[in-house]
């Protein structure tokens, strides 16, 4: 499912996409995806893309409830110590196992991404250290009581140490280091134009709905609407307010607020 986190907005989509039977979904977006590096720039389009390629220890539902991500469970052991258990059998897109050591690497990387214009370090400000208990168990020590730690970790995409240890942001953008554990794998990123994803069939026990997903950057509102009406794309975001009545009246289309 294509999800967008953040402020409420509207989507217009072709009714043909609703049963999710199509093999290829194309979405035209108002704002560009600027990087595949999930720790480089905290911006809504980048976060939306990262939801599909990477996973977080803890995820959020559409109603902002916390739900298991890479972690199947978490609990406080004391006021300044949390235990997280990773999902057995979780794998990266290259087939390698996701381990607690990848989480340690991720937490160390987040505040140290070179030239980041606005990253995610603030979400980890309470973390003092992480202990690997075994490959699927880790203990996170905090500097002070941190009851919101699971909520903060819902913002942090976990990346592979193997592929990220020597990688720069450019290596994520090229695809070399963009090896996630999410439902889709990154196929191609053309900055200012499009991002292409392909389904990862090894994700959990679930099969993602579309085989391929393309995000196109179309900043002109009229161009997005025209592309939708012509059938060139299946979904657009932020349709012009003046066009919403017309789009709602078209039986081939649906308009939704998220």
Question: Predicted segments — roles?
Answer:
Residues 28-78, 108, 115, 177-180:
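N-terminal lobe/hinge region of extracytoplasmic solute-binding protein
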Residues 72-116, 139, 224-227:
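Aromatic- and charge-enriched surface segment that lines or borders ligand/interaction sites
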Residues 15-19:
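N-terminal signal peptide c-region/cleavage motif recognized by signal peptidases
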Residues 23, 245-258:
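Ligand-binding "clamshell"
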Residues 154-208, 212, 222, 230:
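Gly/Pro-rich hinge or "lid" segments in bacterial periplasmic/extracellular proteins
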């Amino acid at each position: 499912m294509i999800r967008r986190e953040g402020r409420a907005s509207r989507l217009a989509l072709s009714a043909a996409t609703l049963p999710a039977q199509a093999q290829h979904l194309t979405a035209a977006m108002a704002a560009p995806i600027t990087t595949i590096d999930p720790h480089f720039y905290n911006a809504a389009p980048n976060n939306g893309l990262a939801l599909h390629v990477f996973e977080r220890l803890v995820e959020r539902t559409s109603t902002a409830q916390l739900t298991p991500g890479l972690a199947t469970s978490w609990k406080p052991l004391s006021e300044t110590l949390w235990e997280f258990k990773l999902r057995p059998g979780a794998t990266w897109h290259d087939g390698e196992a996701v381990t607690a050591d990848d989480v340690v690497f991720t937490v160390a990387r987040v505040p140290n991404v070179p030239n980041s214009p606005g990253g995610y370090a603030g979400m980890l400000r309470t973390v003092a250290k992480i202990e690997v208990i075994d490959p699927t168990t880790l203990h996170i020590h905090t500097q002070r009581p941190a009851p919101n730690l699971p909520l903060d970790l819902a913002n942090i995409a976990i990346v592979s140490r193997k592929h990220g240890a020597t990688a720069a942001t450019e290596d994520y953008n090229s695809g070399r280091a963009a090896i996630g554990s999410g439902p889709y794998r990154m196929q191609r990123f053309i900055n200012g134009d499009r991002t292409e994803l392909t389904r990862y069939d090894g994700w959990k026990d679930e099969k993602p709905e579309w085989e391929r997903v393309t995000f196109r950057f179309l900043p002109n509102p009229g161009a997005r609407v025209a592309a939708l009406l012509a059938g060139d794309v299946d979904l657009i975001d932020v349709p012009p307010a003046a066009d919403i009545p017309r789009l709602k009246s078209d039986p081939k289309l649906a308009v939704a607020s998220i």
